[in-house]
């Protein structure tokens, strides 16, 4: 109730004619975090549902949680596998300092140690994405006088999950800014764009800075360590050669392999998919159609 009174008291300053009217999109963004928007349709058809855009986007963000948790674990696992073989006195960096400060070992057999270490790579990238992309979103919202769309929460999460853990933070910011502006805002904003902002930003980084987005040295954040992904091995030598590299089908399915932060685990992706199907946010027909199209055209091109 106190929150409601607070928002009601400052709302006139952000409405048309108020001293902060240009900042209304920011006010609306914060208010709708706590309360349902009062905006309703004025012309038919009227869809009577509690599921609005904010709730849909919230469900999509929830569906990424399995991939996020696996990003923590697998990034820490791949890093600790190599760090456990190095003398701790030779290690440096703020992540190493924090882990040693709290007595967290570089033990690849410890779930907690892997999760903690992986989180120290995930959160800087995600926070950078939120800040850089969020500033772009707010800028265009205030300039055009429309609300800040919740879809950016989804874009920021998906973009983060597609990046290697070794991506420099300045590059993270550059990619998401490009994705938001070129992938969405130049077309008029959410609902008018035909490009996915997250994938647009990722594609930009891939072509602009290929050495940071591909190869054998970008997947494990340990200096001097090179390790190819299962896809690159399969492309170069055939999938039968994966066994010789110590990669089994169960490893590939669970995701205990090298790769981008949130893209290694098929199981985590399927759990997120199941959530979207159960909540009816995703339509199984679209998913089957996309898979069928990908398989057919990939077969032709190969």
Each language-model region and where it sits:
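N-terminal signal-anchor module of multipass membrane proteins
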Residues: 1-122, 126
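C-terminal ends of transmembrane helices
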Residues: 41-47, 132-144, 181-191, 271-280
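Hydrophobic alpha-helical transmembrane segments
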Residues: 57, 61, 123-127, 150-154, ...
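Structural signature of hydrophobic alpha-helical transmembrane segments
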Residues: 115-129, 166-175, 256-266
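Hydrophobic, membrane-inserted alpha-helices
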Residues: 131-137, 152-161, 176-183, 267-275, ...
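A generic, well-ordered mixed alpha/beta core segment in the N-terminal half of proteins
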Residues: 149-220
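Long hydrophobic alpha-helical segments that form multi-pass transmembrane helix bundles
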Residues: 188-270
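Alpha-helical transmembrane segments
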Residues: 278-302
């Amino acid at each position: 109730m106190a929150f409601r009174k607070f928002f009601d008291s400052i709302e006139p300053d952000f409405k048309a004619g108020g001293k902060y009217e240009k900042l209304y999109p920011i006010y609306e963004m914060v208010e709708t975090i706590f309360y349902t928007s009062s905006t309703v349709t004025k012309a038919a058809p009227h869809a009577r549902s509690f599921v609005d855009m904010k709730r849909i986007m919230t469900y999509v963000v929830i569906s990424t949680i399995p991939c996020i948790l696996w990003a923590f674990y697998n990034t820490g696992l791949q890093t600790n596998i190599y760090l456990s073989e190095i003398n701790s006195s030779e290690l440096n960096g703020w992540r190493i300092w924090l882990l040693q400060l709290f007595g967290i070992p570089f033990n690849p057999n410890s779930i907690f140690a892997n999760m903690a270490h992986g989180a120290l790579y995930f959160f800087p990238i995600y926070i950078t994405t939120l800040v850089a992309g969020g500033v772009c979103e707010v800028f265009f919202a205030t300039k055009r006088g429309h609300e800040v769309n919740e879809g950016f929460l989804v874009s920021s999460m998906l973009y983060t999950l597609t990046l290697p853990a070794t991506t420099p933070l300045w590059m993270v910011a550059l990619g998401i800014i490009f994705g938001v502006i070129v992938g969405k805002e130049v077309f008029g904003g959410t609902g008018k764009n035909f490009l996915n902002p997250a994938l647009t930003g990722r594609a930009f980084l891939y072509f602009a800075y290929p050495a940071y987005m591909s190869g054998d040295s970008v997947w494990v954040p340990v200096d001097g360590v090179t390790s190819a992904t299962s896809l690159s091995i399969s492309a170069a030598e055939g999938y039968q050669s994966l066994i010789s590299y110590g990669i089994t089908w169960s490893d590939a399915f669970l995701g205990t392999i090298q790769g981008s932060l949130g893209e290694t685990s098929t199981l985590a992706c399927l759990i997120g998919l199941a959530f979207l199907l159960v909540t009816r946010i995703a339509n199984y027909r679209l998913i089957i159609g996309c898979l069928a199209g990908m398989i057919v055209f990939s077969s032709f091109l190969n």
